[in-house]
Amino acid sequence: RPGSSELKVCRRSGLYKPPRSHFCSVTRRLTLNMDHYCPWVANTVGHYNRKFFLLFLLYTCLLLAYVLLSIAPQLPDLFDWALDGDGRWVGGVAYAVVLGVMLAVDVLLLLLLGPFMCLHWKMAMRNQTTIDGDRLPQYDIGLSANLEQILGRRRLHWFCPCYCDGPVGDGVHWPTKTGGAALVPLGGSGTPLRTSAAVRHRPLG
């Protein structure tokens, strides 16, 4: 059959291995368009839940930025030691400590997650994954089409943390710049061979 020479079988699961899929050693599953295993959400980020991972990073960074802007006007209180008429400090140490800890943790998380979020959104815009990197440029079919394969076709739903209509495509066939797509091997009955990669992930969290 045309393209049969390109069909691969996963050595660890013994199942058909679609293009861009990888075996996750943590969940022991063959994952469609696998990006990485995230211990913070205890799940593998792949074709059917990558949208939620991207939104998780985006909204977490926005929340951290909002908290930072909210406490910024109170920063002078860290150095405003209230004194009585005799020059003795009146109090407020607990408030100053809490404010200082909040500021330090918020800035640290924002400095760590901000670049991480930008990296993953940049890869999404280029139709890349952490595993594939820039080794597969043929899957970069344009900014809009790339994002539709993750966020869905309806742009009003892109930033909604719900599945909605789901990502464009089935995670098995991937359009390329040349207009081609990977072929799915057929069994004797004319149906695709069994692959655990066709099973959707559970939602993040």
Regions found by a protein language model. Name each.
Residues R1-G205:
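Membrane-associated feature with strongest affinity for ZDHHC
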